[in-house]
Every structure is written in C-alpha cells, then in structure tokens.
Amino acid sequence: MTQLTLFQTARDHVSLVRMVKGKMRYYLLAIDYSLFGDCILEKIYGGMGNSKPTRVLREYYSSWIEAKERLEIVSQAKKKKGYKPLVTTI
C-alpha cells in the first residue's frame, strides 16, 4: 500500500444517473481515506431536484482493494437496474 502524506489524497469515484417516472435520480460512489488510514466507500443517492441527498451511506474497509472491489460490485448492480454513467463534456 502506498503511504500518503498529509496533503495527498487518493480518490476513486463513479457517478450514475437514471430516469424514474419522469424524474432524474443519481447515485454517487466514492472511495476515500479516513484519518486513521481506513478506506471509506461512500454511497450518496437521491433525486436531481432535491436540495439534499436522500441518503448518505458509508462502509469502512481495511484496504483500498477491498473498497474498490465493493465499488465495482455496487456499480454493476446499479447498472443492471438501469443506471448509466454520467457523461460530461467540457
């Protein structure tokens, strides 16, 4: 595992969207490190028109690899339910 200094961050994320009954829904998955070196998989989801997310869930893992594997599993499950990657152009 790579040791991070105070100002370095490692991050991995996936942004998914889908249309449900005429409304856009989003599902964000992000991996980040905690202050104690654990990896956190954060799942944030809700409706696009809402000012706050419907729910924010955090799962803690001892390694980046475990968190990344879980991110891939959740991402694939959401894609099976109709979520598609959010594509942005600059």
Residue ranges and their predicted role:
Residues 1-3, 69, 86:
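Compact soluble domain cores
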Residues 21, 45-46, 81:
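Feature targets compositionally biased, intrinsically disordered low-complexity regions
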Residues 77-90:
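Short, mixed-charge low-complexity intrinsically disordered segments
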Residues 1-22:
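Negatively charged, low-complexity tracts enriched in Asp/Glu with abundant Ser/Thr
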